């Protein structure tokens, strides 16, 4: 699996509390453990105060297992076990445009000054979720390119 330019975020609302990691990766299933290769490039994994470690990695057995975070922001107290990392920032608030708990208003575009700006690899896709082109060279992390 190869995930590019993902923004994965979870925030509590007045009705629901955020209490589980936004990403859980495991090579175990109902029929036992299997091979796993997953690469996350130019991604953001973030949540509010409900969870300290937003990424959970679980390896079972002795099968082939590779999880790699390449240019990413993780809300994480420490690097998860069983992963490789390249240019990963831990606990660097990505500064989303709006995370308004009271009004249940969320906008995961990046503010100016976000540590995610210009920190990605030039790997594509060529456009963000709004249809805006991504520049050659250092792209923003996440699914939106700041305009």
Each model region followed by its residue ranges:
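Predominantly extracellular beta-rich ligand-binding scaffolds that present long acidic/polar faces
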Residues: 1-109
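C-terminal accessory segments
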Residues: 87-147
